[in-house]
């Protein structure tokens, strides 16, 4: 099917689920910074009206200021509203020691769990991401810039959704644009200009006279963030990856140290696919990796592209270390302390992170 419309969505850093992701990853950052390669972190976060709960399992987690880290992250995101203010949060810390049974298989850098992970890349744009998810992210990044640059009636919680028309398998135009953004009371009629500015600045000629716009279609979005909807870590896994354009193995990234292959192997799969496309071996590439808990080598590797799949797979198998330790060492994942900053607007794309670097 070469002619079709495909839709993807993104959410802002103030979306409740993303607030949870950022808190979980801020604790991962702190644990890794204060620990070493024996540090293990698996932390989930729940946020709701004036309330944050963190729970999970850790090892060699030398962090004694958990509540301060949470408040600082919420303040950084920008929440100072009555129902969710960084200074008035009730915070419950239920973090405890990791099971010794898990450590038996992972202390020697076996995979931290079983699972399947996918990576994808395409030559549709410089970010090497499918256009619908790429532009969904870019719209919200631009909207945040505007919010911080004078449009102070805009508030942190926002969502976007972009429908791209493909003709002959190539990006043709934007068919539908949906943007919902939280705002201060009384400013519901002031949104159209900044939203359209944000969209037009990133999408350019893809917007035409036939593009349909939906800007705050419910009419009012004052109560937002965790005060409007409960947020949980790991509920935006499609936003985090490829917007549904490629499969997802089901495992979330945030709140997990690099021995968890849900995170590290997904980063590797993306890096592999991106380098295949960057080397002009294919216009698009999809990689699947699978692992078993405590086992170092992947249990399977699968390559799908419009190139020579067997040649690509053979090269990967013979030249790339796909063990958890090999992945961790290649990308320096135990010395990367910016997981919290990287978990918004997708984990992939035009980002200065090790798994987005070009070069074998």
Residue ranges and their predicted role:
Residues 1-40:
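N-terminal, positively charged regions that mediate nucleic acid binding
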Residues 39-43, 158-164, 211-216, 282-292:
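A short glycine-rich, hydrophobically flanked beta-strand micro-motif that places a catalytic Asp/Glu
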Residues 2, 48-49, 122-123, 242-248:
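Short connector loops/turns at beta-strand edges and beta->alpha or beta->beta junctions
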Residues 48, 284-360:
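Internal helix-turn-beta structural module
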Residues 40-61, 293-297:
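Short, charge-patterned binding micro-sites
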Residues 186-277:
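Glycine-rich anion/phosphate-binding loop at the beta-strand->alpha-helix junction
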Residues 7-10, 49-51, 68, 72-80, ...:
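Glycine-rich, mobile lid/loop segments that gate access to catalytic sites or pores
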């Amino acid at each position: 099917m070469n002619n079709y419309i495909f839709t993807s969505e993104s959410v802002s850093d103030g979306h409740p689920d993303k607030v949870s992701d950022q808190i979980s990853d801020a604790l991962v950052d702190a644990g890794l910074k204060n620990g070493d390669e024996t540090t293990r972190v698996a932390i989930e976060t729940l946020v709701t009206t004036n309330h944050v709960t963190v729970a999970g399992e850790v090892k060699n987690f030398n962090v004694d200021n958990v509540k301060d880290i949470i408040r600082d992250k919420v303040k950084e995101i920008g929440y100072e509203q009555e129902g969710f203010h960084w200074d008035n949060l009730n915070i419950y810390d239920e973090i405890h020691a990791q099971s010794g049974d898990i450590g038996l298989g992972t202390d020697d850098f076996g995979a931290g769990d079983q699972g399947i992970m996918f990576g994808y890349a395409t030559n549709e744009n410089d970010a090497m991401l499918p256009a619908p998810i790429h532009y969904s992210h870019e719209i919200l990044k631009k909207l945040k810039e505007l919010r911080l640059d004078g449009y102070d009636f805009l508030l942190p919680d926002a969502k976007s959704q972009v429908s791209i028309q493909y003709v002959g398998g190539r990006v043709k135009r934007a068919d539908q644009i949906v943007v919902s953004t939280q705002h201060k009371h009384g400013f519901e009629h002031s949104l159209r200009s900044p939203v359209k500015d944000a969209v037009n600045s990133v999408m350019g000629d893809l917007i035409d006279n036939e593009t349909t716009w939906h800007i705050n279609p419910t009419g009012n979005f004052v109560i937002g963030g965790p005060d409007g909807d409960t947020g949980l870590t790991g509920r935006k896994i499609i936003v985090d990856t490829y917007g549904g354009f490629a499969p997802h193995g089901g495992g979330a990234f945030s709140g997990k140290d690099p021995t968890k292959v849900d995170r590290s192997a997904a980063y590797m799969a993306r890096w592999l696919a991106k380098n295949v496309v960057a080397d002009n071996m294919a216009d698009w590439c999809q990689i699947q990796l699978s692992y078993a808990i405590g086992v170092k080598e992947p249990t399977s590797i699968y390559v799908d592209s419009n190139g020579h799949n067997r040649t690509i797979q053979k090269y990967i198998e013979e030249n790339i270390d796909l063990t958890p330790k090999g992945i961790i060492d290649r990308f320096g994942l135990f010395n990367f302390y910016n997981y919290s900053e990287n978990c918004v607007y997708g984990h992939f794309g035009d980002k200065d992170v090790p798994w987005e670097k070009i070069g074998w």
